[in-house]
């Protein structure tokens, strides 16, 4: 069964952020939600899974249609080499019988000749050589020994399993889009940090220029600032390259127009969870449970092979002219079929299917254990990332104050330009670190809600 292979693949996803999610849409940017929906419509794997689910639903309808009467219209023309007649002795007997009946009706002795004008009919043919037939047949299964009933239930649960599996596939794609979107937001936030650093360097360049004019600084200090500015340009190019790659990734994932993605400016905001205890059953677990039920009903279907089956049949001839003397114009009947012994095949097939159900039960237990461990791990990771944001906030404050102090000292000739550039570098690093901490905190939120099955999109 295809569901087995797909679920097995899901089971080997890394522990962190490994399972599906279903209560986070209020914190997602509306445009991000739109991108996710476009991605869900575009993704080929999701489309294939939807087709598989639709096929399973058709299987269910096919099983139900077993109880619908089947009506067949028949038409044929046959020409024999000759009419089919009675043998000569039988024909003579039939003619003699006619004569006796005529004499009896006329009230004359049997041994007297036939009265004048008495007509004898030639014996009818058993079958004329030209045969034109038109008929209708009706076949109707009245009782399938519960095979059809169990087949319908098996198909129903298989379709449900594929639907849940499709939801899990959608979750995986949504996570990819959310991650790419947040990474793009991190790039934009980092570019703002570079813009601030560029403003600081511009300010330092103007100060050093005036200091050189007044003989208070050397051209070397200006060269150092120019070098720092070139390093910023290099970083900006790196961020532009990352932005281009991320936009291309979003184009591939969502099918959105590139120019539309280039116009958006995603924001990277801190996202705090109000409640980390809510939890729902994962789509993977639901898919496994439905698959388990499907094979259970399949086993019942195979086991019911020994139960008698009952069917009705009917036949009606529209044309009577060419019917043989032995053909009925219509008939109806009821039949029973009972497979008393099939060499243990049904029993062995049912046993094999039951073992397949045990495999699903084992996978369910394994998945539940993995989910429980994943939730604990993601809760700890979330708390750690929240604390990291608080710590880095203090680092940014300290770096900001340090830069202001050293910059003031430099203006009072108490610190060198190297000290100012070092302080600016540390401030820049602290801000980068802060934006990355926010990104990791958002990622931890997604991973936790994902693990608990409470992330919507």
Where do the language-model regions lie?
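Bacterial Sec-pathway N-terminal export signals of envelope proteins
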Residues: 25-86, 216-218, 251-296, 300, ...
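Amphipathic alpha-helical coiled-coil segments
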Residues: 48-63, 169, 175-192, 210, ...
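Flexible glycine-rich, low-complexity coil/linker segments exposed to the extracellular/periplasmic environment
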Residues: 85-87, 92-126
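Membrane-embedded beta-strand positions in outer-membrane beta-barrel channels/transporters
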Residues: 135-137, 181, 311, 333-335, ...
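Bacterial N-terminal signal peptides
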Residues: 11-22
């Amino acid at each position: 069964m295809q569901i087995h292979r797909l679920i097995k693949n899901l089971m080997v996803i890394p522990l962190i952020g490994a399972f599906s999610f279903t209560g986070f849409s209020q914190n997602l940017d509306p445009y991000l939600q739109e991108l996710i929906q476009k991605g869900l419509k575009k993704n080929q794997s999701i489309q294939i899974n939807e087709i598989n689910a639709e096929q399973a639903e058709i299987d269910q309808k096919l099983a139900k249609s077993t109880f619908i009467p089947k009506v067949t219209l028949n038409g044929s023309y046959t020409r024999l080499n000759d009419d089919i007649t009675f043998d000569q002795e039988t024909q003579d007997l039939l003619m003699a019988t006619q004569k006796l009946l005529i004499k009896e009706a006329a009230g004359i002795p049997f041994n007297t000749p036939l009265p004048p004008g008495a007509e004898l009919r030639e014996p009818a043919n058993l079958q004329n050589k030209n045969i034109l037939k038109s008929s209708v047949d009706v076949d109707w299964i009245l009782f399938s020994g519960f095979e059809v009933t169990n087949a319908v239930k098996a198909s129903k649960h298989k379709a449900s399993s594929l639907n849940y599996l499709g939801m899990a596939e959608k979750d995986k794609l949504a996570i990819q889009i959310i991650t790419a979107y947040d990474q793009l937001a991190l790039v934009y936030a980092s570019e703002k940090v570079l813009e601030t650093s560029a403003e600081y360097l511009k300010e330092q360049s103007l100060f050093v220029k005036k200091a050189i004019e007044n003989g208070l600084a050397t051209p070397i200090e200006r060269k150092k600032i120019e070098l720092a500015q070139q390093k910023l340009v290099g970083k900006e190019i790196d961020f532009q390259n990352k932005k281009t790659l991320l936009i291309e990734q979003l184009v591939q994932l969502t099918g959105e127009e590139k120019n539309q993605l280039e116009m958006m400016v995603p924001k990277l905001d801190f996202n705090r969870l109000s409640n980390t205890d809510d939890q729902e059953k994962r789509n993977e677990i639901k898919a496994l449970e439905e698959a388990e039920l499907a094979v259970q009903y399949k086993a019942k279907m195979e086991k019911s092979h020994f139960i008698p089956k009952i069917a009705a049949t009917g036949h009606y001839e529209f044309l009577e002219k060419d019917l043989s003397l032995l053909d009925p114009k219509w008939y109806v009947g009821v039949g029973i079929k009972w497979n008393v012994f099939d060499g243990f095949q049904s029993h062995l097939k049912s046993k094999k299917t039951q073992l397949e159900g045990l495999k699903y039960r084992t996978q369910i237990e394994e998945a539940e254990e993995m989910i429980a461990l994943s939730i604990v791990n993601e809760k700890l990771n979330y708390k750690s990332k929240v604390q990291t944001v608080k710590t880095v906030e203090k680092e940014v404050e300290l770096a900001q104050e340090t830069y202001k102090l050293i910059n003031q000292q430099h203006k009072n000739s108490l610190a060198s330009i190297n000290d100012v550039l070092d302080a600016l570098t540390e401030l820049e690093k602290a801000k980068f670190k802060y934006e990355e901490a926010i990104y990791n905190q958002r990622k931890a939120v997604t991973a936790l809600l994902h693990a608990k099955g409470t992330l919507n999109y």
